[in-house]
Amino acid sequence: MARTVHCALLKKDADGLDFAPYPGELGQRIFDNVSKEAWAQWLKHQTMLVNENRLNLADARARQYLARQMENYFFGAGAEQPAGYVPPTPT
């Protein structure tokens, strides 16, 4: 049976993650408070941040930046958008 969490991002009850997706306290907080649906949305946003900002994930500063963005995305004011980002218009 799937775990249910009250998702901090989506503000509704939804299926929880199967395991902590990130190490440490932040990973546990995400596991306890973020749904699978919200995590999938973060992965898309994270991919955009990596690509648009040309982040090298071998660089510790890039990983720290992504960790800060992840915490802000789920529990803060929201993650940054890349410079010049224009959201797609619904069709």
Swiss-Prot record:
A Pfam family that the UniProt record links to this protein: Iron_traffic
Matching PANTHER family: FE(2+)-TRAFFICKING PROTEIN-RELATED (PTHR36965:SF1)
Protein name listed in UniProt: Probable Fe(2+)-trafficking protein
Source species of the chain: Methylibium petroleiphilum (strain ATCC BAA-1232 / LMG 22953 / PM1)
A GO term, aspect molecular function: iron ion binding
One of the GO biological process terms: cellular response to oxidative stress
HAMAP family xrefs: Fe_traffic_YggX
Family: Belongs to the Fe(2+)-trafficking protein family.
GO cellular component: cytosol
Domain of life: Bacteria
InterPro entries per record: Fe_traffick_prot_YggX, Fe_traffick_prot_YggX_sf
Keyword Isomerase: no
Keyword set, alphabetical order: Iron
Job description of the protein: Could be a mediator in iron transactions between iron acquisition and iron-requiring processes, such as synthesis and/or repair of Fe-S clusters in biosynthetic enzymes.
